Each structure stands twice: as C-alpha cells, then as structure tokens.
Amino acid sequence: MARLKQVYKDQVVAKLTEEFSYKNVMEVPKITKITLNMGVGEAIADKKLLEHAVNDLEALSGQKVVVTKARKSVAGFKIRDGYPIGCKVTLRGERMWDFFDRLVDVAIPRIRDFRGLNPKSFDGRGNYSMGVKEQIIFPEIDYDKVDRVRGMDITITTTARTDEEGRALLAAFSFPFKK
C-alpha cells in the first residue's frame, strides 16, 4: 500500500472528521484522481516534440498517455480540427497515490524559487489545479535526455464539497500552501 494512502487512513480521516464534525466516515473527502496535462502547441511545426512530451508523461505516470487533438480550427494559431496538440493522463488508485507521494515529497521541493502553492487555485468544488513550469523537477525525467523544458498542468480531483474541505484535505498531507 502506498505510504500516503496509509497516512490518509490512519491520520487524515480522523483529523478531518474532528475538524468538520462528520457523522459518517464516508463523508470525509478523499482524492479520487490526478490528471496530468501537457499542451504542446509547437507540435504543429514538429511532430517529434509531441512524441517527447508523450514519453515524458509516460515516464512520470507509468501508464499509456492519451494524445489530445484540437477541437476546432483556429487560423491565428495555424491549427486545424483534429491536429494533435497535447497529451494527458489520468491517474487513479495505487499509481495516483504513488505519484502524489512523489509530487509532495520530491517534485515540489525541487521547484526553483518556490514560495508555496497558491491556496486560491481551487475551483469552488474542492478540486485543486496547479501548473509546473519545468518537467525536470520529477526524478523520473532524465535531465540529459530532455530536448526542451516543458510545463504541465496537474489537477487533483477530490470528493470535497467546498474549497475549505479540499484545502484541509491537501494540507493534512503537508501540501505546501502559501501562508
């Protein structure tokens, strides 16, 4: 069992039940999935860039990546409907917990000039989204084999009903929010 999953069961559930006075253990918010998204707009000119992005995400997630395609044509961006312009992967279960552990303990501390995560990046329903400017903060990415530094979006979806519950859930995992 993943370390943070055990922490959730042993400590976080009790802490949140006490803090929000839940009557049932099933009311306690939990993380349901983590979505990683990498937009590669430059893939229009060079298809190899998308392949490198897919390889990076596969190394991070340990599972197959879905290539996202443009939904409609935009002349200003020189894209047509159906052009591959990014990739994403959704993590659930054990892989999600393993990635979350690496994100909190390894990747976030390696961010350059890090002053804490924005506590206002919740969507109103307890889900948290954050952007990472460099994929090289993850230990799975070999720095010497990186062709270009790319960023990615990381969305943590929870069962929390409010932002306050979601913030308390992530803070219980020692998520480094700005004060």
UniProtKB/Swiss-Prot annotation:
Transferase found in the keyword field: no
Top-level taxon: Bacteria
Gene3D superfamilies named among the record's database cross-references: 3.30.1440.10
Keyword Transport found: no
Family: Belongs to the universal ribosomal protein uL5 family.
Subunit record text: Part of the 50S ribosomal subunit; part of the 5S rRNA/L5/L18/L25 subcomplex. Contacts the 5S rRNA and the P site tRNA. Forms a bridge to the 30S subunit in the 70S ribosome.
Protein known as: Large ribosomal subunit protein uL5
Organism: Marinomonas sp. (strain MWYL1)
Lineage: Bacteria, Pseudomonadati, Pseudomonadota, Gammaproteobacteria, Oceanospirillales
Chain's gene name: rplE
